[in-house]
């Protein structure tokens, strides 16, 4: 069967939730037995988000094959079973880099390189290549219609709509329908102007998804349909909700999936959304709550830790607990003490880079260890747990990471200079290598030790998890640290790199070098996060007596 394409654009304002809407539609179509993928086309000039500030851009989501991508790909994986790869996200910078490299090699035979056709052709090529083998490919265009940065992408999808034909393409446009309190009514004019802007570049939307803080009245739906030349049944209202996992059923109730399948002439069964109904039931019927102290350096923007936040919520669903996250700037622990940790039920230290706030993370790890509070360390959170234990238990007072102090007397954490990438190829780097794309990235095998908490939670000796790091535990210090009571319970497939450490004397102290948050989903959860929140629930009961 030929691939069918749904192109998703946004108008009026940014951050309308195109990614959530696209993922929710994909979830319904997948529930109808269709093989679905989603792509995100980002209009910024960066080659990828790998070196962008998390405070500006949000988290970097890592795919199975090691691509550093937009956080929307995390939404995609949480809503559908398809695993994202490097083909599912590319930027203006990536496209231009490829075209310029090919021009320097002489591949264009001296032609003048232009946005049309060279840039648009490369965009089209990547869209087609990344969509092969799927029944439906949903293509989300980042930014807002009217932005100068988005023009090459919009022109490319306009051309694809013509070349592939209407029988296999559909354009879905998200807009904002604001409510004006002074007038006491919703206003459709911004949507009308947004569609007018889209039509001016040759794209007529087939579906409008109208975001609002309330239900869209039938009269306004008719008005929007009249002025935008969109069928009234294809004007979909999408009011604000308290859980993004309600959106698939909301879109299903308005027959958006039927509009899609009829457009593409697809004969498939009705959507079975019972898994999503179970998620919503778990979410709305908790048996208790826990508070997790989340000690990070980018906490002013929760989206910097989007997948961790979601993984904690998923673990709450599986344990029937509401997870309250208390964000704590690690620098505050350095300057204001540990009072914010005193009534938490668990402590989590996530990944990060650089030495700012590192002492605060060490304080958090020490507080969890000394007070027997469940602790989960991720990536840098594992490294600080190792450093803290080395300093305060193993007697290595000069312990540190060479990332923070190249001349420390006990470098228990150091730069990885050689490793295998996700495809099995050897990678080399040193401290002078570029920052972008030079980490140990992607899904890697990890072997779990018998008798460990990790093995009990995962239920199997070999697992695969995704990585994003340059620094690793120095193997020369494993023996003295294990003699002092720490236990290494997970190694890389070649036994060269430490993946998991545990403190057997502690009720629940587990730290991992990989990023388990990237594989957690609302339907399945994740073994580590489920175990962590279960331990938090038990600690909460004991704490309250």
Swiss-Prot record:
GO cellular component: a single term: cytosol
Amino-acid positions noted as binding Mg(2+) in the UniProt annotation, renumbered to this chain: 72, 140
Annotated stretches, region: Amidoligase domain: 1-266
One Gene Ontology MF term: glutaminase activity
Residues engaged in binding L-glutamine: 352, 380-383, 403, 470
Pathway: Pyrimidine metabolism; CTP biosynthesis via de novo pathway; CTP from UDP: step 2/2
EC number of the protein: 6.3.4.2
Gene3D superfamilies linked to this entry: 3.40.50.880, P-loop containing nucleotide triphosphate hydrolases (3.40.50.300)
NCBIfam families: PRK05380.1 (NF003792), PyrG (TIGR00337)
Family statement drawn from the similarity comment of this UniProt entry: Belongs to the CTP synthase family.
Cited PANTHER family: CTP SYNTHASE, CTP SYNTHASE-RELATED
Function: Catalyzes the ATP-dependent amination of UTP to CTP with either L-glutamine or ammonia as the source of nitrogen. Regulates intracellular CTP levels through interactions with the four ribonucleotide triphosphates.
Misc remark: CTPSs have evolved a hybrid strategy for distinguishing between UTP and CTP. The overlapping regions of the product feedback inhibitory and substrate sites recognize a common feature in both compounds, the triphosphate moiety. To differentiate isosteric substrate and product pyrimidine rings, an additional pocket far from the expected kinase/ligase catalytic site, specifically recognizes the cytosine and ribose portions of the product inhibitor.
Protein name: CTP synthase
Source lineage: Bacteria, Pseudomonadati, Pseudomonadota, Gammaproteobacteria, Alteromonadales
Gene that encodes the chain: pyrG
């Amino acid at each position: 069967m030929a691939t069918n394409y749904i192109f998703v654009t946004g108008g009026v304002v940014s951050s309308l939730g195109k990614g959530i809407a696209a993922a929710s539609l994909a979830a319904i179509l997948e529930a109808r037995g269709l093989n679905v993928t989603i792509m995100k086309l980002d209009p910024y000039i960066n080659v990828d988000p790998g070196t962008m500030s998390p405070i500006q851009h949000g988290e970097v989501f890592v795919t199975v094959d090691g691509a550093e991508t937009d956080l929307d790909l995390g939404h995609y994986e949480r809503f559908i079973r398809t695993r994202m790869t490097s083909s599912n996200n590319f930027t203006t910078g990536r496209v231009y880099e490829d075209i310029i490299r090919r021009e320097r090699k002489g591949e264009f035979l001296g032609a003048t390189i232009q946005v049309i056709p060279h840039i648009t052709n490369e965009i089209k090529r990547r869209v087609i290549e990344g969509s092969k083998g799927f029944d439906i490919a949903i293509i989300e265009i980042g930014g807002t219609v009217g932005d100068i940065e988005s023009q090459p992408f919009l022109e490319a999808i306009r051309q694809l709509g013509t070349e592939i034909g209407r029988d296999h393409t559909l354009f879905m446009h998200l807009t904002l329908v604001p409510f004006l309190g002074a007038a006491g009514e919703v206003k459709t004019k911004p949507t009308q102007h947004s569609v007018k802007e889209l039509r001016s570049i040759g794209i007529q939307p087939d579906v409008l998804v109208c975001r609002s803080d309330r239900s869209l009245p039938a009269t306004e739906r008719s008005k929007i349909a009249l002025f935008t030349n969109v069928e009234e049944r294809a004007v979909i209202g999408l009011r604000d909700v308290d859980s993004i996992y309600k959106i698939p059923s909301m879109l299903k109730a308005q027959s958006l999936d039927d509009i899609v399948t009829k457009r593409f002439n697809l004969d498939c069964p009705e959507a079975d959304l019972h898994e999503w109904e179970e998620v919503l039931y778990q979410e709305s019927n908790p048996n208790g709550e826990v508070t997790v102290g989340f000690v990070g350096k980018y906490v002013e923007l929760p989206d910097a830790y989007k997948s961790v936040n979601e993984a904690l919520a998923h673990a709450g669903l599986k344990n029937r607990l509401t997870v309250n996250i208390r964000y704590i700037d690690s620098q505050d622990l350095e300057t204001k003490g540990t009072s914010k940790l005193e009534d938490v039920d668990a402590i989590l230290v996530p990944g990060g880079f650089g030495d700012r706030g590192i002492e605060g993370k060490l304080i958090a790890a020490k507080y969890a260890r000394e007070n027997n509070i469940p602790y989960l360390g991720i990536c840098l959170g594992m490294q600080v747990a190792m450093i803290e234990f080395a300093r305060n238990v193993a007697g290595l007072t000069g312990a540190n990471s060479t990332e923070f102090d190249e001349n420390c007397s006990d470098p228990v954490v150091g730069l990885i200079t050689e490793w295998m990438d996700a495809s099995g190829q050897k990678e080399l780097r040193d401290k002078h290598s570029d920052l972008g794309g030079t980490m140990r990235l992607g899904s890697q095998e990890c072997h779990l030790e018998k008798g460990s908490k990790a093995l009990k939670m995962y239920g199997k000796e070999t697992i695969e998890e995704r990585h994003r790091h340059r620094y690793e535990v120095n193997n020369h210090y494993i023996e003295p640290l294990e003699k002092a009571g720490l236990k290494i319970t997970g190694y890389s497939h070649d036994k060269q790199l430490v993946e998991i450490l545990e403190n057997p004397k502690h009720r629940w102290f587990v730290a991992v070098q990989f990023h388990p948050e990237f594989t957690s989903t609302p339907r399945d959860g994740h073994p580590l996060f489920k175990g962590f929140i279960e331990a938090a629930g038990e600690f909460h009961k004991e704490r309250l007596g």
